[in-house]
Amino acid sequence: MKGLVRLLTVFSLLLGCWGWLGTTQIAQAGSLQSFLVPQIPVLAIERQNRADAKLATEFGEKIDLNNTNVRAFQQYPGLYPTLAKKIIQNAPYGKVEDVLNLPGLSDGQKQLLQSNFDKFTVTELEPAFNEGDDRFNNGIYR
């Protein structure tokens, strides 16, 4: 009896795998047009955040006394860290010349600042550059 069950099982599997001996239907390729969504042109505008917009102005080329961090002053001898710290702590400024009114500046420091006026600019305070303590420690360590 077990032999008959095995033979019947093997025969039915072979018959099923052969597809009833060629009686299967031919596969028809479907059209993709029924699945495609019609293409509609989208008019997109270039989005830019306020920080990127500010970097495209003078801010990206000069030191902005209201928004730049302390490390930016390293490239100018004599400004980092003492004068840079004073400048940042007493911001905001209305114009570049206002930096000469800082309390406790010596005549030498004032002359140093005046000699670098062409490297400074003043723009409105931007929260993206002033939030937290990023102006004092922007997390760049060497």
Swiss-Prot record:
What cellular component GO annotations does this protein have?
extrinsic component of membrane; photosystem II oxygen evolving complex; plasma membrane-derived thylakoid membrane
Question: Main localization of the protein?
Answer: membrane
Superkingdom to which the source organism belongs: Bacteria
Its topology with respect to the membrane?
Answer: Peripheral membrane protein
- Subcellular localization, as worded in the UniProt entry: Cellular thylakoid membrane
Query: Carries keyword Membrane?
Result: yes
Q: What protein is this chain from?
A: Photosystem II extrinsic protein U
